[in-house]
Design a protein with these regions (language model features):
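Glycine/proline-rich loop-helix segments at beta-alpha junctions forming the active-site rim
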Residues: 2-10, 20, 32-33, 112, ...
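Active-site and ligand/interface coordination hotspots across diverse enzymes
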Residues: 2-84
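Charged/polar, solvent-exposed surface patches and flexible loops
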Residues: 52, 92, 131-135
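Amphipathic coiled-coil/heptad-repeat helices and related helical stalk/stem segments
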Residues: 86-87, 129
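Short catalytic helix/loop segments, enriched in acidic residues and glycine
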Residues: 87-95
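Alpha-helix C-cap/termination motif
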Residues: 96-97, 139
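Short connector loops at secondary-structure junctions
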Residues: 100-116
């Protein structure tokens, strides 16, 4: 699994691989001090979690307990820097509801713009998807 972070306040980006299947490794990989990020299955055929944050505490972390999770069918083209129309709508909805950030999850992690093509993939769920859905739902509001 590969995790990529968007630029933080200092303009730095981050990317690294996580090989352990433990939830603690996933939690460590999702560094919420970055305002955006995404977890991918190498070579980015599957996207497991995408996040955006906009409301932060004085120490730079997202407001605790103020991140919501959206669950869609399958991811499209959004990544840690560029949203797609669905992610943009979810960001706007989360802001309107008063959240300080959001996670985007999907029932199937395979990245495909056409759901019919996604269904033909031999492994549309991805090996880390269920574990990461449980983890993110446990830390969201």
């Amino acid at each position: 699994m590969r995790v990529r972070h968007g630029r933080n306040a200092a303009g730095e980006t981050g990317a690294f691989s996580v090989t352990a299947l433990a939830e603690t490794a996933c939690a460590d990989a999702m560094d919420l001090s970055y305002p955006s990020g995404a977890t991918f299955h190498d070579p980015e055929t599957h996207r497991y979690v995408l996040w955006r944050t906009w409301a932060r505490t004085d120490d730079g972390w997202p407001s605790p307990g103020r991140m919501c999770a959206f669950i869609g069918l399958n991811p499209s083209t959004a990544d840690e820097n560029d949203p797609d129309p669905t992610v943009t709508r979810c960001i706007n909805r989360a802001k309107a509801l008063g959240y300080g950030g959001m996670f985007m999850l999907n029932l199937f992690a395979y990245r495909e713009t056409e759901a019919a093509l996604m269904r033909k993939h031999p492994e549309p769920v991805g090996p880390f998807n269920d574990m990461l859905i449980r983890h993110v739902c446990g830390i969201s509001s």
